[in-house]
C-alpha cells in the first residue's frame, strides 16, 4: 500500500471562532494589501503568533512544523496528521492540508500543494530556522524569499475593538488569579500549591466566560524569597516564610492571547529596608502610568523613569524594560519587540495599542532589602490618554498579607 503524503480531514463541524468573521477578514485584507504593495505573491507563516492571528489556529508543535499559506485568494493551514481534524475545525480560512509522517519532508509537500508556484514569497526571518528555510527554497528554486515578520508585527501592534474586549477579559481573569494567590498564601505553604490554586481559578474563569474555547497554557509564577530575583523564575517547592518578599505573576491565556498581573507582596510583615525599596518601585510605577498616552515615545518614557531610580540610587538594580505590548503572545512565542518601553525603542504610542507598565528592581542576596520588586498594570492607549484595566491593588498599604 502506498501511504499518502497529504490528507484532508474534515472531522466534525467548524467551531465558533474566537473573533468575528469580519475581524479575520480585516486582518487578512491588511496582510494582502501589504503583500500587493511589496509585489509578494504569497506569505508562508510558520510562527505560533502569526498563524493564530490570521487564522485562529494555535498549533501544538511537539517537534513538528506548521504553516499558514496566504495568497490573494486562499488562506490554507498546514498541520500534522497527529492533530486529526482539530486544525481544520479551528482554521478561519479556505482550507486545511494535513501532512503525514510516512515520508520525509511531507510538510514541504503540503506547502507546495497549497502554493504550487510563486515568484516572491514572504517568510518570517525571525522564526523560520535555517534548515527549513533551505528546504523551502529548494521547493521554489526560482522564487525570492523575503521577510514579512516585521511588517506583520507592526500590524499586530494596533489592536482592534474586538481584541480590546478580549484583553479586558484577560485582565479581569488575571485579577481573579491574583485573589486566589492571596487566598492560598500562608506560612510554610510551598510555592507550587499557591500557583496551582491560582491557575485553577483562572482556567475556570476562562471556561465560564468563553464558549468553545481551548484551555491551554494558562499559568502562574509565584516566587518567594531569593526566587523573586528573576521575573521568569519557575515555581519551586520552596515554602513561604513570614517576612518573605513574594512575587505574584498570573497569566491567563485565552485563544493564544496573553494578559498578566504581577505584584510584590509580603507575608505578615515587611522590613524597613524592603519597605523603602518597595516604595521607590511604586513611585516609578505610578509615574510610568501617567506617561502612557498617544504621542509618547517609548525611549523617552524609559529615560524619564530612569531618572527616578537614579534619584534614589537604585538604577543599577533595574532588570529589564518598563513595559511591553499585548496580544497573541506567550512566554514561547509572539513578542512584539517593536512596542517595548526601552531606551532602544523609538516607537511612538498610538490609540489602540496595549502596553504594560512594569518597573522592576532586584537587589542580590546579602544587601539590605534583597529581592525582586515588580508591579504590572495593563493600559489601553486611547485618543486622550490611556485606560488602566488592571484593578488588583498594589503597594504596601494593600499587599502586606496578614493571616
Swiss-Prot record:
- What Gene Ontology molecular function terms does this protein carry? creatinase activity
Q: Identify the catalytic residues.
A: 232
The domain of life is Bacteria
What Gene3D superfamilies does this protein's entry cite?
A: Creatinase/methionine aminopeptidase superfamily, Creatinase/prolidase N-terminal domain
- List UniProt keywords, sorted A-Z: Hydrolase
Q: Does the keyword Hydrolase apply?
A: yes
- Which InterPro entries does this entry report, sorted A to Z? Creatin/AminoP/Spt16_N, Creatinase/aminopeptidase-like, Creatinase_C, Creatinase_N, Pept_M24, Peptidase_M24B
Q: Record's Pfam families?
A: Creatinase_N, Peptidase_M24
Reaction equation(s) it catalyzes: creatine + H2O = sarcosine + urea
Q: Does the keyword Hydrolase apply?
A: yes
According to the UniProt entry, what is the EC number of this protein?
A: 3.5.3.3
Give the family per the record.
Answer: Belongs to the peptidase M24 family. Creatinase subfamily.
**Domain-related comment:** Each monomer has two clearly defined domains. The small N-terminal domain (AA 1-161) and the large domain (AA 162-403). Each of the two active sites is made by residues of the large domain of one monomer and some residues of the small domain of the other monomer.
Oligomeric form and interacting partners: Homodimer.
Q: What is this protein called?
A: Creatinase
Amino acid at each position: 500500500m502506498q501511504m499518502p503524503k497529504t490528507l484532508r480531514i474534515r472531522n466534525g463541524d467548524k467551531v465558533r471562532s474566537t473573533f468575528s468573521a469580519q475581524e479575520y477578514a480585516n486582518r487578512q485584507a491588511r496582510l494582502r494589501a501589504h503583500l500587493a504593495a511589496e509585489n509578494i505573491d504569497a506569505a508562508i507563516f510558520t510562527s505560533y503568533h502569526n498563524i493564530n492571528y490570521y487564522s485562529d489556529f494555535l498549533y501544538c508543535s511537539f517537534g513538528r512544523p506548521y504553516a499558514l499559506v496566504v495568497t490573494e485568494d486562499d488562506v490554507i493551514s498546514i498541520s500534522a496528521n497527529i492533530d486529526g481534524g482539530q486544525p481544520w475545525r479551528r482554521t478561519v480560512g479556505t482550507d486545511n492540508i494535513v501532512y503525514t509522517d510516512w515520508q520525509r519532508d511531507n510538510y514541504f509537500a503540503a506547502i507546495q500543494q497549497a502554493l504550487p508556484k510563486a515568484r516572491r514569497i514572504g517568510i518570517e526571518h525571525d522564526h523560520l530556522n535555517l534548515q527549513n528555510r533551505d528546504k523551502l527554497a529548494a521547493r521554489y528554486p526560482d522564487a525570492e524569499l523575503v521577510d514579512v515578520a516585521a511588517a506583520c508585527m507592526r500590524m499586530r501592534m494596533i489592536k482592534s475593538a474586538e481584541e480590546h474586549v478580549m484583553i479586558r477579559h484577560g485582565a479581569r481573569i488575571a485579577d481573579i488569579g491574583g485573589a486566589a494567590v492571596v487566598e492560598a498564601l500562608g506560612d510554610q505553604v510551598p510555592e507550587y500549591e499557591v500557583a496551582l490554586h491560582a491557575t485553577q481559578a483562572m482556567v475556570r474563569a476562562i471556561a465560564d466566560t468563553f464558549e468553545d474555547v481551548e484551555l491551554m497554557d494558562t499559568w502562574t509564577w509565584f516566587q518567594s524569597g531569593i526566587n523573586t530575583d528573576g521575573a521568569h523564575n519557575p515555581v519551586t517547592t520552596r515554602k513561604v516564610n513570614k517576612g518573605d518578599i513574594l512575587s505574584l505573576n498570573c497569566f491567563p491565556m485565552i485563544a493564544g492571547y496573553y494578559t498578566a498581573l504581577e505584584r510584590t507582596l509580603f507575608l505578615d510583615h515587611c522590613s524597613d529596608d524592603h519597605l523603602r525599596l518597595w516604595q521607590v518601585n511604586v513611585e516609578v510605577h505610578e509615574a510610568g502610568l501617567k506617561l502612557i498616552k498617544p504621542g509618547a515615545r517609548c525611549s523617552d518614557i524609559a529615560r524619564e523613569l530612569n531618572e527616578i531610580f537614579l534619584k534614589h540610587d537604585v538604577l543599577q538594580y533595574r532588570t529589564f524594560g518598563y513595559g511591553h505590548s499585548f496580544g497573541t503572545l506567550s512566554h514561547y512565542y509572539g513578542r512584539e519587540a517593536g512596542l517595548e518601553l526601552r531606551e532602544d525603542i523609538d516607537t511612538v504610542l498610538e490609540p489602540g495599542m496595549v502596553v504594560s507598565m512594569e518597573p522592576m528592581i532586584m537587589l542580590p542576596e546579602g544587601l539590605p532589602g534583597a529581592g525582586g520588586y515588580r508591579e504590572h498594570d495593563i493600559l489601553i492607549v486611547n485618543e486622550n490618554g490611556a485606560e488602566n484595566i488592571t484593578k488588583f491593588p498594589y503597594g504596601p498599604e494593600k499587599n502586606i498579607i496578614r493571616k
